[in-house]
Amino acid sequence: MLKSTWSWRLAAPLATCVALAALLAAPTRVTAREKPPLARTAPLFEFHSNFWVNLHQVLFHEAWLRAGKPVRGLQSAAPLSAAGMSSQDEADWRAAVSFYAAHFANRQQHGDDQLIQINDDLAGQPDNGARLSPPDLPPELIAVLHRAAGVYRRYWWPAHDESNEHWIASQAQRLQHLGPGLAAAMTKDLHQQWPAAPIRVDVCHYVVALGYALTTLPPHITFSSSDPFNPGLDRFELLFHEASHTFADTTMNALETEGRAQHKDVGDLWHSLLFYTSGVELRRLLPASEQATFTPYGYRNRVYGGGHWPAYRRVLEADWQPYLDGKIDFTDAIHSMVADLP
């Protein structure tokens, strides 16, 4: 049996990474009591199309399909298939999917230490023909991945890798033109700096669920290159929304402290605030021709539509927006949002 939890480990960077140098510029709004952050010299993100992470994510996706999971959490409603597969290849692939279905089909990547560890460990494995060597992965999982690797490489990996590289290239121009300003604005808004090292982004053909996943120790985003639900600017905005989880502690702590002082449950207000902030700041940076048609991800996808989130939207629009507009300070915005929660 696989262990239920594994220790965290920093995945080693790949020599073949694709780094896009989007450097931080000075903030667009600085008050008298705020100093602009030092100019950033490291890239914001480091992009990879890693064979082993892609294989793992594909098998996880196939396992969800076999279990009949909702299509909204998947990028395709049909299992992978290929003409001319040998009977041995079919048997090897079915065995790998069966293993994943037995161990992972009823689990989510978000918050699952074991799945996080698998993804992080595989991200440190180069595709150089050598056998997998992460010390924290159990031998039975390594054996399954090795058995499936040849099948995946023969039938699907070339097309998936091409799709991933196209996705990475599609973000390059926007990162160059919008990335520095968006990162500067969001870190200023949240009173916390971007991580010192570039955030690793593993681009995969499939990512369960919703087409993206994030872990913060270390910062690591996994993003689908084929997700039909996140087209165009949604992808770019989501990239920065996910990144903002890595510099949200100051805001989260401020909300929780104010909530205790006012005897209010602030719940997931911090998370709705991240969606709201990335949308507002991205719109401000877009050319006028795009601003007119741009709808932030949170609104377009009805993120604020269920549970306590309609109330979060109201306090964000009433109390956080004036802060983003420079009309009130951070402390007043935090106090007002909590006070206006039901």
Language-model segment annotations:
Residues 294-342:
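Pan-zinc metallopeptidase signature
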Residues 1-8:
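N-terminal secretory signal peptides that target proteins for export/translocation
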Residues 13-25:
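Bacterial N-terminal signal peptides
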Residues 223-239:
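Short pre-active-site segment immediately N-terminal to the catalytic Zn-binding motif
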Residues 236-253:
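Active-site recognition of the HExxH zinc-binding catalytic motif
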Residues 30-32:
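Boundary at the C-terminal end of the N-terminal hydrophobic targeting segment
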Residues 159-216:
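Auxiliary, metal-adjacent structural segments of Zn-dependent hydrolase domains
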